[in-house]
Regions:
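A detector for small-residue-rich transmembrane helices and their helix-helix packing motifs
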Residues: 2-193
Length: 193
């Protein structure tokens, strides 16, 4: 039973990603653009703040993000995770911070208010950047919630590789560099909390 409790934090986001993928692509209730991040649409349609992470443009996109969740799970196990809901806490904390960064970049830095964005990769790279610092320095608490992450050189090296690959991958066509950078910065901020 304890194993199942620990896995819930990874099963829930994976299930939501698969469920929305099936609803959008096989049932046709929504279009991807109806639920995606859209800078100018966030004010009138705030549900997009929650929905865009769980929407994916195609099956390969979905699988690559599910692979990221599996990597996060492996790393949490090797960091001797004490809090069985840490990944869910990180999702809840990363989402608004990442959305804020994207909104600022899109509306004030690059003035691209029609920017559309989907996918879980911003949360994944945000979690990777959080784990990079946690594996280097250790992290006992987030907002007075005990998490008890210990230093781990193996995870530090793994996160360095995955974050580097994530940044390089961001320069490919149709991949959101701003989404990945916002995720990385959000993970660093959460580490500081």
């Amino acid at each position: 039973m304890k194993i199942i409790k620990k896995e819930v934090q990874f099963i829930i986001p994976s299930f939501l990603c698969f469920l929305l993928f099936i609803i959008i692509n096989f049932k046709g209730f929504f279009f991807v653009s109806d639920l995606s991040y859209w800078s100018i649409g966030l004010i009138k349609q705030p549900y997009r703040i929650l929905s865009y992470s769980f929407v994916h443009k195609d099956f390969n996109h979905l699988l690559s993000n599910i692979f990221g969740i599996i990597v996060v799970r492996y790393c949490f196990i090797n960091l001797n995770l004490k809090n069985i809901f840490l990944f869910l806490y990180l999702i809840i904390l990363l989402r608004p911070i990442q959305t804020f960064f994207l909104f600022i970049v899109d509306n004030f830095l690059f003035y691209n208010p029609n920017h559309l964005l989907v996918g879980f990769s911003g949360i994944i790279v945000g979690t990777f950047s959080f784990m990079l610092l946690s594996s280097l320095y250790g992290k006992e608490y987030i907002l007075n919630i005990y998490i008890g992450l210990k230093k781990n050189n193996e995870i530090y090296k793994l996160m360095t590789v995955f974050l580097s690959l994530g940044i390089v991958y961001s320069f490919l066509p149709s991949i959101s560099l701003s989404g990945h950078i916002a995720g990385i910065l959000s993970g660093f901020i959460i580490f500081i909390l």
